[in-house]
Regions:
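Mid-to-C-terminal secondary-structure elements
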Residues: 92-104, 118-259, 459-648
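Hydrophobic alpha-helical transmembrane segments of multi-pass inner-membrane transport and secretion
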Residues: 1-11, 259-295, 322-323, 327, ...
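Hydrophobic, regular-secondary-structure patches
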Residues: 15, 24, 29-84, 94, ...
């Protein structure tokens, strides 16, 4: 029980320590935007490109700002090999002013101020150069250009809500200075001045937003900000303290999958329940065997020992047992930690067990356990009267001990509730794997970075279709399991009335996309190269169709402004409606989506129809090497990519199930011990009953019926609680 509690304590401690490595963690906040546009609602962890700089300029409480944004994977040349690196981000040069990222080599004031430069972590520097003294050296990226290394930082701690290995200067992103305040794509962080009240800063955020958004809203949709808000729309900004992001933020466009404070509460509760069950076991077994020490107590009292002396003696004995249990628990936790890290996805070092704060926590835990588990047995044993001992009135049975029976009931109430919780979690995990997502992800291979092929991408796709075992192949900018997204707003008339605006995911795909991914067309038709008009055709999902609420959706027109600085409006017509499919978390409702017909070659998804998948992959790779011999062949399976979206949920569920099973096992061991002792106390009775012809079933029923009654009582209490 103690070892299990230690592991949970390490997990909870790790979760609560996120981002606290930053020296100014209490002064750093992330800026969020919340948008209501017609019937569309977005809760975003991102902002317009210029919001951070405007806050520094117009709000004296804001000392500095820094932006981060995912760059996407790159290929780095090492010898003759191109190695894929996935954790690459754009960052402002002020990154090192806001966050505590110690630089080993280079100057943090200039490190991210050069085009075609990189700041890398210590691990990356050693991986490619076997040294951290690499400032000034270059890395060949994507076989297209050399990037100069301008800084090497220490590895970012695991307890960070972002964890990049490469930082690219923000100036390399063409949208870094975009003055469109209606486009949110940037994770923006601000460093507040000392003794600044976050609430006061938040109160000034919306007036700042309105000053910049109002004129642009008027320009784009010819509506004032007041009219926009009267129609029910709004754009609001807020701040999230840095240390609250990991456990308290679940917004759209988070930099990485966050945790959940509810899980911390749940695991803490499980730790307490396991500790309680273990203490109850100890108390029950100690008092059950009390008759073994009754004569000792009687003799000591006859010789003049006071009750307080006996209580002190028994408490001392029990505390020594607690000390021994703590030592065994520490050794057990040490040995189990690698397996626990693998289960939880953590990287907790065994030395953590011996950090000062941890040692204090463990000593406090030992004291509480010793006091909780030892008090009742100590007072119970010291209450024996010499006369009762001599007369043999003390019994080790269970019917007379209402407190012991109550503790058994408590144990099994906890165990039954945990059993129900385990079943629910297991079914949730099964639901994730078996849910009909509205698209086929089985045996679909996604080839990444096909945009590097340029015009050769179509040729490559067509050659893949000639391979035996390939049923279909499609080019697109997004797949349903991508983290990246592209949102745009469309209107039902050229008046661009905000009240009729609909925010939709906008994905460019080819004519094979819908059949290759097994999507179902409910109305209309698929894209076709036979219709020139399909260049402005779109296919929407059910969620978009429901918003439009039109009986005749086919050929209905939708409009969107071409860009912020133009009065031009792009017109599209609906040619089909597809069944909703999940392209975000299963916790979220499916939002409106539109597919556009075009040449987007970000990736190619291949539907495989063969039992010999390795052979098909080998032939696909051969085709790739023929077309792009110098480019790395990078692929993944769509079902694996889908599972990665739910890694946090799956790990959390597995941890819960593991600890719940341990709690149930500990409770069962305690009950087994009590039943075994009860059998020992009734050996003579069992012998007599056997002589008189009692069967094994009769004897088993006799020994277990009292406990079965307790389990039944526990069930009546636990079922409503679990429900």
């Amino acid at each position: 029980g103690l070892a299990t509690c230690m592991l949970i304590l390490l997990y909870v401690r790790d979760e609560l320590s996120y981002d606290r490595y930053n020296t100014n963690a209490d002064r750093i906040c992330r800026v969020n935007n919340e948008i209501r546009f017609g019937d569309n609602y977005f809760d975003l962890a991102v902002t317009p490109a210029l919001q951070g700089s405007a806050m520094v300029r117009e709000m004296p409480q804001v000392q500095q700002y820094a932006r981060l944004r995912w760059h996407g994977s790159i290929f780095v040349r090492k010898g003759n090999e191109n190695i894929r690196e996935g954790r690459v981000g754009y960052a402002d040069s002020s990154l090192f002013d806001v966050f505590t990222l110690p630089m080993i080599e280079g100057d943090p004031r200039t490190a991210l101020k050069e085009y075609h430069s990189l700041v890398v972590t210590e691990t990356i520097a050693k991986k490619y150069f076997n040294s951290t003294d690499v400032v000034g050296k270059t890395m060949l990226v994507n076989d297209t250009g050399n990037y100069k290394i301008t800084g090497v930082i220490k590895d970012i701690p695991k307890q960070s809500h972002f964890n990049f290995d490469f930082f690219v200067p923000m100036m390399e992103n063409e949208g870094a200075n975009d003055d469109n305040w209606l486009s949110e794509n940037w994770n923006t962080y601000v460093l507040l001045r000392k003794n600044t009240d976050v609430k006061q800063v938040e109160a000034q955020l919306n007036p700042l937003m309105n000053r910049h958004i109002g004129p642009q809203l008027q320009s784009i949709v010819n509506k004032s900000l007041d009219d926009f808000e009267k129609s029910g729309g709004y754009i609001r900004a807020s701040l999230t303290p840095l240390t609250a992001i990991h456990l308290h933020s679940n917004k759209t466009a988070e930099l990485d999958a966050n945790g959940n404070i509810q899980f911390v509460y749940i695991f803490s509760a499980i730790a307490l329940l396991i500790l309680l069950i273990a203490c109850v076991n100890f108390m029950n077994l100690s008092t059950a065997r009390s008759s073994n020490r009754s004569k000792e107590v009687g003799v000591r009292k006859v010789l003049g020992s006071l009750r307080k002396n006996l209580v002190q003696q028994f408490l001392t004995e029990l505390f020594l047992v607690s000390v021994f249990a703590l030592v065994v628990a520490i050794v057990s936790a040490w040995l189990l930690l690698p397996s626990f890290n693998q289960l939880s996805g953590k990287d907790i070092h065994p030395a953590t067990l011996f950090q000062p704060k941890m040692i204090i926590s463990l000593l406090a835990l030992m004291f509480i356990v010793g006091l909780l588990a030892g008090s009742y047995p100590a007072f119970f044993l010291s209450s024996f009267q010499p006369v009762d001992v001599l007369k043999g009135k003390l019994a080790g049975g269970f019917k007379r001990s209402w407190l012991r029976n109550s503790l058994v009931v408590v144990q099994f109430v906890i165990s039954i509730v945990l059993i129900f919780g385990t079943i629910v979690i297991y079914r949730q995990l099964s639901y994730i794997h078996s849910k009909d997502l509205g698209f086929n992800r089985s045996q679909v291979l996604t080839i990444n970075h096909t945009d590097m092929l340029g015009d050769r991408a179509i040729t490559f796709r067509n050659e893949l279709l000639q391979i035996s075992g390939v049923r279909n192949a499609t080019m697109s900018c997004f797949t349903p399991v991508n983290f990246a997204r592209n949102n745009n707003t469309y209107f039902t008339s050229t008046a661009l009335n905000p009240a009729t605006g609909i925010g939709m995911q906008s994905w460019t795909v080819d004519e094979n996309y819908i059949p290759a991914l097994g999507m179902k067309i409910l109305q209309g038709r698929n894209f076709s190269t036979q219709f020139a008009s399909d260049s402005t055709g779109i296919i929407i999902n059910e969620a978009a169709a429901k918003f439009l609420a039109s009986k005749d959706l086919l050929n209905k027109k939708l409009y969107t402004p071409r860009d912020l600085h133009s009065k031009d409006i792009d017109e599209y017509h609906i040619i089909g409606v597809i069944k909703n499919f999940n392209f975000s978390s299963l916790r979220d409702v499916v939002t409106p989506l539109a597919l556009f017909f075009g040449k987007s070659n970000g990736n190619i998804s291949v539907q495989i129809n063969s039992a010999n998948i390795p052979d098909v992959i080998a032939r696909i790779k051969d085709k790739w090497k023929t077309i792009a011999p110098s480019q790395a062949f990078d692929y993944s399976f769509m079902d694996d990519d889908f599972n990665k979206l739910y890694t946090t949920e799956q790990r959390t569920g597995q941890i819960f199930i593991t600890f719940a099973v341990l709690a149930i096992l500990i409770a069962s061991l305690g009950l087994f011990g009590l039943i075994t002792y009860a059998a020992e106390q009734r050996v003579k009775e069992v012998g007599i009953r056997k002589v008189l012809g009692a069967s094994l079933r009769n004897i088993a029923g006799m020994l277990s019926k009292d406990f079965l009654k307790l389990v039944l009582i526990a069930s009546f209490i636990a079922f409503p609680v679990a429900w």
